[in-house]
């Protein structure tokens, strides 16, 4: 099991009385829109890595939705190193240029790439095309040209879900509403930063309480264990100061990055409080049944005397409330004691232990369910030349199929 700083109780999933559905509150259309990058990023711009948002037009969205991968012609003249000898000038001239329908978007993307240093990583409103990196020459999310971006976006199932099913399993905000809201789609271009995946963390917030935290990368990292209390303190303070009272919804999931020297917390993403969000080292049933950490609970009874534990750096501080005319009963005291005994002091911070079976998955391919045959993968891992050669052959095959189809149609007339 993944490592946590407290003993993990027997999973509720082992019960014979399992619920047929996870006990999520209804996920509304507005909650999904609030978790869209274009909605929350302007509010937290100073907390996020440098990025630019490009509003997308209907023709460009139609291009992303269309079957097949047809890329605009490159402006640069191919060289011998490009291994594009499978293309002839005539064949290149015959290929349609899809960007003629959205020239302004195409130009804006080229300009933005240059402004952000020449290398960016793309995403749409909610998802990044991480499942399509096998199509990229570099096998990652780095993009240097608009065509690099288009290839990733059009090859990604995650992007298709953003476009086709953004409100899957959602309910209207108003019970009598029968329509779904329009989505203002945006292309997000983020300046490329070589993130250390071991320092990315997913944080779960329920009713404006930071409930639990875990690694995003599911490998074991020895150095994280001595840092756990420092990282938890940083994340708690970041949440309390920046997100707790400013995000529109009380429950959500956010991702952060805390690079050395572990002083600054970067907000990477905000995700819905919904089953579609990966709970990673937890299960959703476990999260939904967790009790709030008592160290960050707020006391509403100002007139009653209480003792509260609060998180302050790496220490536990006792806060005593004044009592004026307190007449709480023994039953109430016993109930409060029971809550304190059963509840954790701080948000659980779960890390992967050395002896976890999944602790050494460095070579395990991610998103394998979204990938294509071995020949395509082999081409993608052989460098820029291999993928370019494969794309050239692919275009040849498509052209021959189209020619044969035209011939068959003529013969049948």
From Swiss-Prot:
Chain intervals with Acidic residues compositional bias: 79-101, 327-343
The protein's name: Translation initiation factor eIF2 assembly protein
The organism's place on the tree of life at top rank: Eukaryota
Binding site for ATP: 123, 126, 128, 130, 190-191, 200, 202, 216, 255, 269, 271
Function: ATP-dependent protein-folding chaperone for the eIF2 complex. Binds to the gamma subunit of the eIF2 complex which allows the subunit to assemble with the alpha and beta subunits.
GO BP term (any one): eukaryotic translation initiation factor 2 complex assembly
Ligand binding (Mg(2+)): 269, 271
GO MF annotations, alphabetized: ATP binding; magnesium ion binding; protein folding chaperone
Family annotation (Pfam families): D123 (PF07065)
Cited InterPro entries: CDC123 (IPR009772)
Gene name, Swiss-Prot/TrEMBL: cdc123
UniProt keyword terms in alphabetical order: ATP-binding, Chaperone, Cytoplasm, Magnesium, Metal-binding, Nucleotide-binding
Keyword Nucleotidyltransferase carried by entry: no
């Amino acid at each position: 099991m993944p490592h946590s700083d407290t003993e993990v109780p027997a999973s509720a999933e082992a019960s014979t009385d399992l619920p047929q559905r996870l006990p999520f509150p209804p996920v509304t259309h507005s909650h999904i829109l609030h978790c869209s990058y274009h909605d929350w990023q302007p509010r937290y711009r100073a907390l996020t890595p440098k990025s630019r948002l490009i509003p997308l037009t209907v023709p460009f969205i139609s291009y992303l939705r269309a079957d097949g991968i047809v890329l605009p012609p490159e402006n640069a003249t191919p060289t011998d190193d490009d291994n594009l000898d499978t293309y002839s000038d005539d064949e290149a001239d015959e290929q349609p240029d899809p960007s003629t329908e959205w020239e302004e978007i195409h130009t804006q993307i080229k300009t933005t790439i240059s402004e952000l240093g020449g290398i960016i990583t793309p995403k749409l409103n909610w998802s990044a095309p991480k499942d399509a990196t096998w199509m990229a020459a570099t096998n990652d999310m780095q993009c240097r040209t608009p065509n690099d971006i288009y290839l990733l976006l059009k090859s990604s199932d995650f992007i298709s879900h953003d476009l086709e099913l953004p409100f899957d399993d959602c309910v209207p905000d108003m019970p009598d509403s029968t329509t779904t809201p329009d989505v203002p789609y945006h292309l997000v271009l983020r300046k490329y930063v070589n993130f250390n995946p071991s320092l990315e963390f997913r944080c779960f917030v329920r009713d404006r309480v930071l409930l639990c935290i875990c690694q995003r990368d599911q490998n074991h990292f020895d150095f994280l264990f001595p840092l756990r209390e420092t990282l938890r303190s940083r994340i708690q303070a970041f949440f309390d100061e920046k997100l707790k009272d400013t995000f529109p919804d009380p429950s959500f999931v956010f991702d952060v990055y805390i690079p050395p020297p572990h002083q600054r917390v970067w907000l990477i993403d905000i995700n819905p409080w919904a089953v579609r969000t990966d709970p990673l080292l937890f299960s959703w049933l476990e999260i939904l049944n967790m009790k709030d950490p008592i160290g960050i609970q707020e006391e509403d009874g100002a007139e009653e005397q209480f003792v509260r534990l609060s998180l302050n750096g790496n220490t536990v501080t006792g806060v005593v409330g004044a009592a004026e005319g307190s007449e709480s009963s023994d039953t109430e005291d016993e109930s409060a004691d029971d809550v304190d005994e059963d509840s954790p002091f701080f948000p659980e911070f779960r890390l992967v232990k050395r002896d976890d079976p999944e602790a050494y998955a460095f070579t395990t391919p991610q998103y394998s369910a979204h990938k294509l045959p071995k020949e395509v993968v082999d081409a993608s891992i052989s460098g820029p030349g291999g993928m370019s050669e494969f794309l050239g052959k692919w275009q040849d095959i498509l052209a021959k199929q189209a020619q044969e189809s035209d011939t068959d149609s003529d013969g049948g007339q």
